[in-house]
């Protein structure tokens, strides 16, 4: 479905729920499987999930489905790239940090925030179940403004439960992919892309017109040398 179609569905469901009386039954269908590694497919060395906005819930499901049900020693490395418009828009980061803290050798998390504050401040985050968690944003020391301009490392960190997560200002760029996710024949990497239509389009090209099939690979991932077998649009 397109973003507009999803928004219309959410609006209709909200009106329906608002009209219900207390104690009225609500029937839920699902969950719907949007992606599953084929049984005949070889396990990749790494699964990268690029998520934008509220679609971050899918990355939390990936972490829990892999690490809570399998032996981490035999599981692929899991990398999550999470892009949001602002610090306040970040969701479920504390849940992902819990996995990062428990499995530091298997989980990596990077954040991209379009509108970063100029100074260090507190960030009000919450878990997937809505429990508020305090976090602190700190600016990393850099020698000069020129060094900040040319440095590929982030200039901010989000500290949650004692764990520092790198935060990049702006959006995920082609340079980010080519420097941090350079394609290699010796390292099997599968990239999952989940987010608003514009987010998916920029990274991997649009899905097919039927909104169900994948469509041709495009965007930054294709420009970085990835193939259709290595990318899945959710």
What is each stretch, according to the model?
Residues 56-72:
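Histidine-anchored nucleotide/phosphate-binding helix
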């Amino acid at each position: 479905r397109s973003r507009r179609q999803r928004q219309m569905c959410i609006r209709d469901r909200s009106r329906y729920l608002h009209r219900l009386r207390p104690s009225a039954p609500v029937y839920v269908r699902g969950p719907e499987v949007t992606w599953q590694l084929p049984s005949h497919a070889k396990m990749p060395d790494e699964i990268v999930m690029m998520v934008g906005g509220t679609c971050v819930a899918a990355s939390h499901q990936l972490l829990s489905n892999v690490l809570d049900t399998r032996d981490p020693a035999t599981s692929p490395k899991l990398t999550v790239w999470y892009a949001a418009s602002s610090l306040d828009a970040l969701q479920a980061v504390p849940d992902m940090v819990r996995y990062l803290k428990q499995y530091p050798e298997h989980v990596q998390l990077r954040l991209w925030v379009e509108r970063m504050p100029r100074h260090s401040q507190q960030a009000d985050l919450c878990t997937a179940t809505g429990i508020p968690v305090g976090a602190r944003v700190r600016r990393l020391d850099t020698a000069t403004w020129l060094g900040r301009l040319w440095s590929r490392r982030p200039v901010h960190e989000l500290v949650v439960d004692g764990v520092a997560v790198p935060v990049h200002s702006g959006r995920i760029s082609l340079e980010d992919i080519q420097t941090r996710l350079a394609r290699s024949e010796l390292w099997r990497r599968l990239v999952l892309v989940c987010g608003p239509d514009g987010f998916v389009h920029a990274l991997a090209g649009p899905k097919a017109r039927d909104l169900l099939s994948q469509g041709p690979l495009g965007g930054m991932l294709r420009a970085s040398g990835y193939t259709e077998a290595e990318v899945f649009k959710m």
